[in-house]
Amino acid sequence: MKLILIKDCPSGKANTIVEVSDGYAKNFLIPRKFAIAYTEENAKKLKQKLEQEKLDFSLKTKEFLELKEKLEKLKLTFKLKASLDKNHKLETHHSISAKKLLERLHELGFDLPKHSIEKVHLNLIGINHVNVKLFDKIVAKLTVVIEADV
């Protein structure tokens, strides 16, 4: 029996056309909503759905590439309390977390989900870079400048 898979299952991935035995289709795949019967109408719907998903994906990709450019031009500056250690080097007492970075980005008008920035604790004075995962394989490199407040 020819079917169109709706969900991923042992027979294949979602949105694919497969050929399986009649019993497997009638007793397992169709009742459990893994698949629907193959008809010309369902095949047209599948084709339209795949074209729409492809279009949506390309639009989202374009959107997130523009966001990536904006984020990479941005420089976030933070001040951390610091003091000289016994070797006369600056030592910070706090760090900048991913949560603080997201809060600052939110203040600047960038609404990103909290999982988009990997867990970081920046405490090195100077220029730091943080990866921001935006969409699929689009990752922006955010520049964070930490200054010493002595």
UniProtKB/Swiss-Prot annotation:
Protein name per its UniProtKB record: Large ribosomal subunit protein bL9
Keyword annotations: Ribonucleoprotein, Ribosomal protein, RNA-binding, rRNA-binding
Function comment: Binds to the 23S rRNA.
Residue intervals passing through the bilayer: none
Xref: InterPro entries: Ribosomal_bL9, Ribosomal_bL9/RNase_H1_N, Ribosomal_bL9_bac/chp, Ribosomal_bL9_C, Ribosomal_bL9_C_sf, Ribosomal_bL9_N, Ribosomal_bL9_N_sf
GO molecular function list: rRNA binding; structural constituent of ribosome
Alphabetical list of SUPFAM superfamilies matching this protein: L9 N-domain-like, Ribosomal protein L9 C-domain
Family stated for the protein in its record: Belongs to the bacterial ribosomal protein bL9 family.
CC terms in the record's Gene Ontology section: ribonucleoprotein complex; ribosome
Record-linked Gene3D superfamilies: Ribosomal protein L9, C-terminal domain, Ribosomal protein L9, N-terminal domain
Domain of life per record: Bacteria
GO-annotated biological processes: translation
Species this protein is from: Mycoplasmopsis pulmonis (strain UAB CTIP) (Mycoplasma pulmonis)
